């Protein structure tokens, strides 16, 4: 039984991959035309489809929307009962129907023409009513479904999904849509945390900043280390410019070497040291700490003045891993 199940699963995947392998050679003028129509659309892309095509259509609409192209899904039946009012003359409709002969099209196509709405087709029958009415046709046809009865949409839905991805990615690249643009539409996700957060969003402020003056003693710095528990202290002049850092490691080395606690900290500190810019991306700042094998750093503003402090744990708690 186990072998039979494995064989059935493998056969399905092989058939779907075989059908999908024909898609690249089908991309041509119609694909370019469809992409350009979407690129120049001043409104939204309205995706529609029935049955399994509708389910895939929802995903295509979501992919377009998250990659820089405003889009939403409308079910054809709902469109014919009022939701056509959502679609405006500035919009584009992408209709998905493998047969290209869905009866709802008989009523939808004239309404689109009345509003001068461009129609794009994703179909397995380019010469169907849908294909003939569309300004661009994306061919998703298959020789056979992966279903052993040749009934359940399987290979055809894979082709539909892949064609939708190809269209969305081509448009995305043409728009110059980048990682930060993507993060703005995913602010609650891990990518949003990685790309949208700046150092100043995560840093410790005010009394939580470990700092001493240049005139402070090693003892003062040691007490500040203990108070804040960050593993370092920023050593600043009277203008709050960071002149160095005094770390747990500096303290250990100082004491092992017989240094006195009354010595000015500027004689025991690491001169300069690593500082992070408050306006830098948090992910970039974390990489600096990792690369330099340190766990914390002072944060400075554009003038080099101390404005905060941060350690690796602050990044991890914000989901920047």
Curated annotation (Swiss-Prot):
Q: Where is this site: Catalytically relevant?
A: 52, 104, 145, 186
What positions does the entry give for substrate binding?
68-69, 75, 81, 107-116, 141-143, 215, 267
Name the InterPro entries for this protein: CBS_dom, CBS_dom_sf, GutQ/KpsF_isomerases, KdsD/KpsF-type, SIS_dom, SIS_dom_sf, SIS_Kpsf
Chain positions recorded as ATP binding sites: 49-54
- Residue ranges occupied by any SIS domain in the UniProt entry: 34-177
Q: Does the keyword Transcription regulation apply?
A: no
What are the CBS domain coordinates in residue numbering? 203-261, 269-321
Gene Ontology biological process terms from the UniProt entry: keto-3-deoxy-D-manno-octulosonic acid biosynthetic process
Q: Could you tell me the EC number(s) of this protein?
A: 5.3.1.13
Keyword field = ATP-binding, CBS domain, Isomerase, Lipopolysaccharide biosynthesis, Metal-binding, Nucleotide-binding, Repeat, Zinc
User: Which reaction is recorded as catalysed by this protein?
Assistant: D-arabinose 5-phosphate = D-ribulose 5-phosphate
Q: Pfam family of this protein, just one?
A: SIS
- GO molecular function, one example? arabinose-5-phosphate isomerase activity
Residues the entry annotates as binding Zn(2+)? 75
Q: Which domain of life is it from?
A: Bacteria
Q: Indicate the family of this protein.
A: Belongs to the SIS family. GutQ/KpsF subfamily.
What is this protein for, i.e. what is its function?
Catalyzes the reversible aldol-ketol isomerization between D-ribulose 5-phosphate (Ru5P) and D-arabinose 5-phosphate (A5P). It is also able of sustaining the biosynthetic pathway of 3-deoxy-D-manno-octulosonate (KDO), a unique 8-carbon sugar component of lipopolysaccharides (LPSs).
- Quaternary structure and partners: Homotetramer.
User: What protein is this chain from?
Assistant: Arabinose 5-phosphate isomerase GutQ
| Gene it is expressed from | gutQ
